[in-house]
C-alpha cells in the first residue's frame, strides 16, 4: 500500500485543554470512541472540549474488520454509567453531545434502554442540551427503536460503514439492509428527528456503488450523510485499498447534495461526530428556513 498522503497527516494531540478533557474522562471512568477507535481528529476535538462518549463498556460483541475496539465477552452493564455520563457532560459545559456504544448483542434489547437512560440523565441536568446518538443495529430487535424514540434524541445516527458488496469482508456479522431498515424505521416513527449515516471510502468500492448507497439512504429518508477515508488502525485490521483524494470527496459531496441530502460531510478526515455541533446547528437553520418558505 502507498504511504499515507500529506492531506491525512495531523498534529500529535496535546495541550492544556486536551489534558483537562483527558483527566475528566478518567475521573468519571468513561470510554470514548475517540480513543478506542484511534480517531485522527482527537486532538482537534478534545481541544474544543468535544468528546464522543462510548457507553456500555469497551468490549464489543462483533468483530468488524475495520474497527479497533476490543472484541470479546463484555461485562454486565454499569447501572451508574448514565449518571456519570450526565455529570461529565455537565462539567464539560457542552451544548451538543454525541453518545455512541459498542455492540451489545448479549443484551435483550441490544442496550437500547441504556442509551435512553443516558439521554434522560443528560437532559435532567440541562434540558437545553441537544443529544446525538450513534447506535449499533441492535440485531433488528423490534423493541429497540421504540425504547430509544421515547428518549427523544435530536439526531439519530447509524452508520452503513461500506457498500453492500464489501459487507462480508468489512462487516461480516451485519447486514446492509437491516441497517437501512433501521434508519427508515427511525424516520417513520420520529419524523422530527434528524437521521444521519456514514460510510468509509478507500476499501475497494466503486463510484457506482457509492452512488447506489446514496440513493438507498435517501429512500430511507436520511437527512445527513458522512463520507470519510478509511484508515487502518492496526496491522490486524483490513488494509486500505487506496487513499481517495480530496477532489474526489468533493465530487461525492456535490452528487450527494444533488440527490437531495440536507447536509453532507465528505472529506478524508470526515467522521460521524466530527464538527457534530456545527452541523446540527446548520441542519436546524435549514429546516427553519424551509418551514418559512412553505408558510
Curated annotation (Swiss-Prot):
Substrates-to-products reaction catalysed: [[Fe-S] cluster scaffold protein carrying a second [4Fe-4S](2+) cluster] + N(6)-octanoyl-L-lysyl-[protein] + 2 oxidized [2Fe-2S]-[ferredoxin] + 2 S-adenosyl-L-methionine + 4 H(+) = [[Fe-S] cluster scaffold protein] + N(6)-[(R)-dihydrolipoyl]-L-lysyl-[protein] + 4 Fe(3+) + 2 hydrogen sulfide + 2 5'-deoxyadenosine + 2 L-methionine + 2 reduced [2Fe-2S]-[ferredoxin]
Database matches in Gene3D superfamilies: Aldolase class I
Pathway: Protein modification; protein lipoylation via endogenous pathway; protein N(6)-(lipoyl)lysine from octanoyl-[acyl-carrier-protein]: step 2/2
Binding site for [4Fe-4S] cluster 1: 34, 39, 45, 273
Residues covered by the Radical SAM core domain: 46-262
Gene Ontology CC terms: cytoplasm
Protein known as: Lipoyl synthase
Amino acid at each position: 500500500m502507498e504511504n499515507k498522503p500529506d492531506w491525512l497527516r495531523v498534529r500529535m494531540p496535546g495541550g492544556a485543554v486536551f489534558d483537562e478533557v483527558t483527566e475528566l474522562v478518567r475521573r468519571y471512568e468513561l470510554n470514548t470512541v475517540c480513543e478506542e477507535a484511534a480517531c485522527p481528529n482527537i486532538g482537534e476535538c478534545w481541544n474544543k472540549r468535544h468528546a464522543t462518549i462510548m457507553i456500555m463498556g469497551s468490549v464489543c460483541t462483533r468483530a468488524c474488520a475495520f474497527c479497533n475496539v476490543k472484541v470479546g465477552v463484555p461485562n454486565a452493564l454499569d447501572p451508574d454509567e448514565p449518571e456519570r455520563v450526565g455529570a461529565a457532560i455537565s462539567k464539560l459545559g457542552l451544548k451538543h453531545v454525541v453518545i455512541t456504544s459498542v455492540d451489545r448483542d448479549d443484551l435483550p434489547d441490544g442496550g437500547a434502554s441504556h442509551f435512553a437512560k443516558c439521554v434522560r440523565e443528560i437532559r435532567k441536568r440541562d434540558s437545553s442540551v441537544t443529544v446525538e446518538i450513534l447506535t449499533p443495529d441492535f440485531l433488528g430487535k423490534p423493541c429497540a427503536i421504540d425504547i430509544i424514540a421515547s428518549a427523544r434524541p435530536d439526531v439519530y445516527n447509524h452508520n452503513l460503514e461500506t457498500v453492500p458488496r464489501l459487507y462480508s469482508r468489512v462487516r461480516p456479522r451485519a447486514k446492509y439492509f437491516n441497517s437501512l431498515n433501521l434508519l427508515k424505521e427511525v424516520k417513520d416513527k420520529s419524523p422530527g428527528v434528524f437521521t444521519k449515516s456514514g460510510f468509509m471510502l478507500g476499501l475497494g468500492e466503486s463510484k457506482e456503488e457509492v452512488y447506489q448507497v446514496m440513493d438507498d439512504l435517501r429512500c430511507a429518508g436520511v437527512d445527513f450523510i458522512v463520507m470519510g477515508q478509511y484508515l487502518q488502525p492496526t496491522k490486524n485490521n483490513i488494509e486500505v485499498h487506496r487513499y481517495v483524494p480530496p477532489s474526489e470527496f468533493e465530487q461525492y459531496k456535490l452528487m450527494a447534495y444533488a440527490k437531495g441530502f440536507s447536509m453532507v460531510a465528505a472529506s478524508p478526515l470526515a467522521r460521524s461526530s466530527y464538527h457534530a455541533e456545527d452541523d446540527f446547528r446548520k441542519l436546524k437553520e435549514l429546516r427553519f428556513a424551509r418551514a418559512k418558505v412553505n408558510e
